[in-house]
């Protein structure tokens, strides 16, 4: 068997917590409960109320009803003891929940017959934890002897003075001295409690240590095999259906947000003179659309305002571009035509721009950009000259060069 030298992983600790194997400093919890009870006893346990009940019964002079007598004493006991018990229970439950990180050990509730195994019982009897408990018991005996010695030296006069105390103060003085004795014992036992918690923490992690094979196996179970993980990543990257891919390839251009919205615009004047939305995706699918368009050579125009406007005004795929966005789409189409013409060294193709009659099908809107299209290439321009505004719809390209098909169109 391989030596367990690796620290327990987070998953190992979570699984152990579900089985009830958590770090438990029981003595610290006991210290908190005892200290809480000692400090709360003088305020919650009032012996004068008990004495007053005796006085009330004796002053009546009549034989009390046994049922009513028992009920009165039970009610008085609950009034005195219930707040004290509830406070001590809360003081013990809260540290226990904090130590277990508020994890409910559901599996530890089941009946386990292996706990009755005598072999495992012998192993627990001669384990490191049993040796620790034996040493701790001897230390507590020494702490108790030290506590009695210190208490006798400090409060022996008060203890012997109880013989001369008035009966009305006798109960209160006993409670005060008992509380002082308990707090003094806890103070003397504090080093032992801290040492016990440190050793318990060490033994807890020692029992949950893992060998290297267990760590690798757990990593494979949680993260998956490297080949399987790579295949899963490839499958997750297939965000686009074949239909959307075909729509991207047939689009005239893609206008992007640039990372959260991708809108495909398709124009075919022979069928419909108005552009319509062929692709409409957001977030991860928008990035996939942009990557696929760049791979297929479809122009990608990064124009935040236009992309948001089309996305807002055209709520569905295969719907026409709204009246408010016609001008922006036309500018992009004219710009792309000029870019293609500049790259080929010829005039821009007429199929990239709507004819003068086509925009009239959209509420009589005049074709935007006609002046730019008419003046893009003067008659006396040399062959291969780029359009004056080939860089963008509003200005020339930097350094006089022809811009690429994928550009930035932040209006």
Swiss-Prot record:
Belongs to the type III secretion exporter family. Signal peptide: none annotated. Disulfide bonds: none annotated. It is found in: Cell membrane. It comes from the Bacteria. The chain crosses the membrane at residues 28-48, 80-100, 137-157, 175-195. The keyword tRNA-binding does not apply. PANTHER family: FLAGELLAR BIOSYNTHETIC PROTEIN FLHB, SURFACE PRESENTATION OF ANTIGENS PROTEIN SPAS. It comes from Burkholderia pseudomallei (strain 1710b). Keywords: Cell membrane, Membrane, Transmembrane, Transmembrane helix, Virulence. GO terms for biological process: protein secretion. One of its GO terms (cellular component) is plasma membrane. This is Secretion apparatus protein BsaZ. Residues 341-411 are annotated as: Disordered. NCBIfam families: FlhB_rel_III, PRK08156.1.
């Amino acid at each position: 068997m391989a030596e367990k030298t690796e620290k327990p992983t987070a998953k190992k600790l979570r699984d152990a917590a579900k089985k009830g194997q958590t770090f438990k400093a029981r003595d610290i919890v006991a210290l908190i409960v005892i200290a809480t009870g000692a400090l709360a006893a003088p305020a919650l346990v009032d012996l004068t109320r008990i004495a007053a009940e005796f006085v009330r019964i004796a002053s009546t002079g009549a034989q009390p009803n046994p049922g009513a007598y028992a009920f009165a004493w039970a009610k008085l006991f609950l009034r005195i003891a219930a707040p004290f018990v509830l406070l001590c229970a809360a003081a013990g439950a809260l540290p226990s929940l904090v130590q277990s990180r508020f994890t409910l050990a559901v599996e530890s509730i089941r009946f386990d017959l292996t706990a009755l195994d005598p072999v495992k019982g012998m192993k627990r009897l001669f384990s490191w934890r049993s040796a620790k408990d034996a040493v701790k018991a001897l230390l507590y005996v020494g702490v108790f002897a030290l506590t009695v010695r210190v208490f006798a030296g400090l409060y022996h006069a008060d203890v012997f003075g109880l013989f001369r105390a008035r009966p009305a103060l006798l109960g209160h003085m006993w409670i005060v001295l008992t509380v002082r004795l308990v707090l003094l014992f806890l103070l003397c036992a504090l080093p032992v409690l801290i040492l016990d918690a440190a050793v318990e923490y060490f033994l807890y992690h020692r029992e949950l240590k893992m060998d290297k094979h267990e760590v690798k196996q757990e990593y494979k179970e949680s993260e998956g095999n490297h080949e399987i993980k790579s295949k899963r990543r490839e499958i997750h990257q297939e965000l686009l259906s074949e239909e959307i891919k075909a729509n991207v390839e047939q689009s005239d251009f893609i206008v992007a947000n640039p990372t959260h919205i991708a809108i495909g615009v398709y124009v075919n004047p022979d069928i419909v003179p108005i552009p319509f939305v062929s692709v409409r995706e957001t977030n991860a699918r928008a990035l996939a659309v942009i990557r696929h368009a760049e791979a297929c050579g479809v122009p990608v125009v990064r124009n935040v305002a236009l992309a948001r406007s089309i996305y807002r005004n055209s709520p569905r795929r295969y719907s026409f571009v709204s009246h408010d966005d016609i001008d922006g789409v036309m500018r992009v189409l004219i710009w792309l035509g000029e870019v293609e013409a500049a790259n080929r060294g010829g005039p821009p193709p007429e199929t990239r721009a709507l004819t003068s009659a086509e925009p009239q099908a959209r509420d009589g809107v005049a074709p935007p950009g006609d002046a730019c299209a008419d003046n893009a290439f003067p008659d006396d321009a040399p062959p291969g000259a780029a359009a004056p505004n080939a860089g963008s719809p509003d200005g020339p390209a930097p350094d006089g060069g022809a811009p690429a098909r994928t550009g930035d169109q932040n209006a």
